[in-house]
């Protein structure tokens, strides 16, 4: 599944995992992306990948 929101274009964040011995390895934090059926126009729905912060903010009308 894509790790990019179709509404706000939020993508993964990158950084390092730091172990107890301070070894650093690359990692990424993915946004919480959900596949939902969203209403694009009245009577017209399509599947979209939307982050949960957009769902919670009401930026998407589920249909």
Curated annotation (Swiss-Prot):
Keywords: Ribonucleoprotein, Ribosomal protein. Coiled coil: none annotated. GO terms for biological process: translation. GO terms for molecular function: structural constituent of ribosome. Pfam families: Ribosomal_L28 (PF00830). HAMAP family: Ribosomal_bL28. Belongs to the bacterial ribosomal protein bL28 family. This is Large ribosomal subunit protein bL28A. The gene is rpmB1.
């Amino acid at each position: 599944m894509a790790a990019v929101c179709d509404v706000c274009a939020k993508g993964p964040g990158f950084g390092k995992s730091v172990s107890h011995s301070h070894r650093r390895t690359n990692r990424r934090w993915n946004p919480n992306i959900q596949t939902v059926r969203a209403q694009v126009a009245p009577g017209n729905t399509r599947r979209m990948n939307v982050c949960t912060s957009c769902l919670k903010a009401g930026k998407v009308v589920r249909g």
